[in-house]
Amino acid sequence: MQILYIDASGDPGMYDHKNSKFYILGGVALSENDWPITSAYFNDLCKKYFPKEDLEEIHTKQLFNGRSLFDKIDHKAMVADVCNFIATAHLTLFGIAIDKDQFLIRGLGKPEDVVNRSLEEIINRFHIFLLNRRERGIIVSDASAEGFDTRIRTLYEYFRKKGTHFWTLTKIIDTIFFTPSQTAMGIQLADFVAYAIKRKCVDGDSSLFDQFAARFGEHNFRLIPDPNRK
């Protein structure tokens, strides 16, 4: 069985030049069989920089900027180690980045459709991944505001029961599960992936993304709208 952990970057509201231009979903999938050793290596990485205390969570933005707990360590070295970990561990990455302004200008949907589209896109790609591997999977999401979690669960249940525009979801089982990011290694890694996508799409800096871009494969990352299509 494969476990897909997902986390969002940015807000889904209409772009007004004061909020985030992109809404991004980052995803990290790993097999239940690979989970124990992957988790152990992840804990070893954290212990390398915090040998005397248990690091509750790698919060990517704080790590990248050397803030909070990360101001007393070589945070750039830790960023490099996390990138290498993602690039070399038995992980498959997923990413959906929606340019909210262009999404509306091109008539691809209404403001409230941004979340729907991003979730549908990442579910489609996870389903294809499971079909190709002849496996089943579950999805675990970072817990956020209660009302937003309810919206995501309602959307997910609709897709699971009725299918997406392209697939009947025969390989994804049960409901979507929510847990705080500090309790799940996979969500922290998904946060890192989402942040790398944000740096690439918003800031024009692909230095993080490029280090593990191969882990997305050919079809698991999508920018919406596709800038190469008119």
Predicted regions and their residues:
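Phosphate-ester processing/binding pockets and catalytic centers
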Residues: M1-K230
